[in-house]
């Protein structure tokens, strides 16, 4: 399971002209689900995403996680993160989970975030989405479990 996380000052996702999720300061989480992923991996990734210390403390050091910084989370499904790009000029998606499995694990990940009392907003799984963000600094990390 893969999360591309970006520290943002604001972010939103729109589907068919409707805003489905919007946050102020916090994390935009682009989530990719691979074939061998399961709930255990989703739990570990959620723990890492919410605990990752990429927000500045009073001394300007990256020492706070999103909860400590008072931020929110916007989770957007992105199957292209599971692409195999090692060769050729076209990505292969053979490493990606089936749509049903990916949606179930995406929903599970979102619910785990909410159980941690995070303000968690979402896109719409498998929809054609427009994602807007203001990347803070920029700060972007690839987390994989």
UniProtKB/Swiss-Prot annotation:
InterPro entries: Daa-tRNA_deacyls_DTD, DTD-like_sf
Keyword Phosphoprotein: no
Listed GO MF terms: D-tyrosyl-tRNA(Tyr) deacylase activity; Gly-tRNA(Ala) deacylase activity; Ser(Gly)-tRNA(Ala) hydrolase activity; tRNA binding
Keywords, in A-Z order: Cytoplasm, Hydrolase, RNA-binding, tRNA-binding
SUPFAM superfamilies the record matches: DTD-like (SSF69500)
Assembly and binders: Homodimer.
Reaction equation(s) it catalyzes: glycyl-tRNA(Ala) + H2O = tRNA(Ala) + glycine + H(+); a D-aminoacyl-tRNA + H2O = a tRNA + a D-alpha-amino acid + H(+)
Range of residues in the leader sequence: none
Family: Belongs to the DTD family.
HAMAP family tied to this protein: Deacylase_Dtd
Subcellular location: Cytoplasm
Task of the protein: An aminoacyl-tRNA editing enzyme that deacylates mischarged D-aminoacyl-tRNAs. Also deacylates mischarged glycyl-tRNA(Ala), protecting cells against glycine mischarging by AlaRS. Acts via tRNA-based rather than protein-based catalysis; rejects L-amino acids rather than detecting D-amino acids in the active site. By recycling D-aminoacyl-tRNA to D-amino acids and free tRNA molecules, this enzyme counteracts the toxicity associated with the formation of D-aminoacyl-tRNA entities in vivo and helps enforce protein L-homochirality.
EC numbers: 3.1.1.96
GO CC, any one term: cytoplasm
Family matches, as Pfam families: Tyr_Deacylase
GO biological process: D-amino acid catabolic process
Top-rank lineage group of the source organism: Bacteria
Protein name, entry field: Probable D-aminoacyl-tRNA deacylase
